[in-house]
Amino acid sequence: INLWMKEYSSELRKIFGNRIWFVGLQGSYGRNEATEQSDIDAVVILDKVTLEDIKAYSALLDSLPYREKACGFISGKQELLNWEKSDLFQFYYDTLPIIGSLNSLKEYFTAADVRRAIRIGACNIYHGCMHNMVHEKSWEFLKGFYKSAAFTLQAAGFLQTGKYERRRKDLLNHLLPEDQAILLIGQTLKNTNLTERKEFERLSATLLSWASHWIVRC
C-alpha cells in the first residue's frame, strides 16, 4: 500500500499541482488492518472539483495497479468544510494524512456533533436491522450492520473517553461491556458463514437492542 500511495500521490501532483489541499488514506489500510480483500480508500481534497477534474481523476486511477480495489472520496475544500458535522468528525479522526493536514477541521465539530454521529449511526442500524428481520432475512445484510456498528462504536468510545481509537483491537479496551460484545460479534461474523435461523434471530435481536439503547441515550 505504501508503494501504491506513493505512485498515487505522485500522479496527483502531476495533474493537480498546488490545487491539492489534502491527500489521505481511510479504511482498513489506514487502520493497518487490511486483508487481501480490502479496498483502497484514498482521499483527495482539491481547491474545487469540476467535471474535467473528475474525469482526470478517474483516468488517473485507471492507470494505476489494483484499479478494482481503488475507491474512497474526492471533494472540493469548501464542500468539505461545510459538510455534515457528524460525518466530518469521523472523517477527521479516521483519515491518515499523506499530503497536508486536517487539523483545521477540529474547530468545525463539537460534542453535540459526536452525539449526532452516534444517534444517526444507531438509527440507521436499527432501521436496517428491523427491515432485514422482517423482509430480507439476510446474513450478509446482518454482517454489514455489525460492520457499521463498529464506526458508531468509535464515536461512542470517543464520547466516553475523549480518545478516538481507529483500530478495532484498541477500541475494544475503551468500550463498555455491552458495546464490546457488539464489536466482538462483528469481528466473529466477518469470517464466518452461518445459516442457522435461530442464531440469525438472536444476533439480530442483540444488535437491535443495542441500537435502541444508543438512540434513546443520545
Predicted features along the sequence, with ranges:
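Catalytic core of pol beta-like nucleotidyltransferases
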Residues: I1-N18, G30-E36, D47-C218
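Short, glycine- and small/hydrophobic-rich beta-strand elements in well-ordered beta-sheets
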Residues: N18-Q26
